[in-house]
Amino acid sequence: VPAKVVAWNHVGGSGLTVAPGITEVKQLAGQSVAIPFWYSIHNVVVQQLFRDNGLVPVSKAAGSALGANEVNLVVLPPSDMPPALASKRIAGYIVAEPFNALAEELKVGRVQRFTGDVWRNHACCVVFMHEHDLDNRPEWSQKVVNAIVKAQLWTRDHRAEAAQLLSKDGANRYTPHAPQVLNRVLAPAAADREAYLASGAIQHSHWDEQRIDFQPYPFPSYTEELVKRLKDTLIEGDKGFLAGLDPAHTAKDLVDDRFVRNAIASV
């Protein structure tokens, strides 16, 4: 389907959550870690963490023997990850919030590392629109992007209120999550940051990253770097097409920043 990335949604907002007894990435050796999808920023970042700690990502059938330095990657829906961790089916998972915060709240896991502390200001979710709409309904398309940019700006300035609105206690029950879980993500206490600095979940304090933040402009340099990293990432299935992708051309071909530029200028 002809479509374009027209904006970023949020940056950061993900983490590697592990069983309570694990305090180092190296302890994941010989165990299984869940990812939400092979083609995800989560898979890219967790494999970088593995390499940095002398671990080798593999994809093997459940119950297969693993090498001493191997970590088996399994794909799970995000909502299945906390129960799988609690039941010890997996030793950890990497995913978007609030499923890391949920594990903390349920005391079934701890955040080993935030992805935004590994890859600074990385995009997670993006806004992807049909090219037909962009070309044939430009005014409507502009209104969509304007609304998203305004929502991002409002959320940045009203984090606690956003957590309440999005929670199961909010008037519209947008998510099934408790307010305190979403507060951990959107409006964390200052003491939380100190604890993460002490544990090593945050190692680049000078980056001053939020647990989740919002920045709509789709920087080409990020898309180029993502294409480069995907080429060296373990991905199930036929990933041969990645070898032929030129990062700079892909960034230009995949992204249409006309609408987000206008939206940013209007707020």
Where are these regions (language model features)?
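Short, glycine-/small- and polar/acidic-enriched structural segments
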Residues: 1-76, 81-87, 91-101, 108-121
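Residue-level preference for alpha-helix termini and adjacent loops
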Residues: 5, 15, 21, 126, ...
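Electropositive, surface-exposed helix/loop patches at the edges of structured domains
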Residues: 22, 149, 153, 267
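Pocket-lining segment of extracytoplasmic ligand-binding domains
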Residues: 74, 78-186
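Secondary-structure end/capping motifs
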Residues: 135-243
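Aspartic protease catalytic domain
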Residues: 243-244, 248-252
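C-terminal non-catalytic accessory extensions
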Residues: 253-267
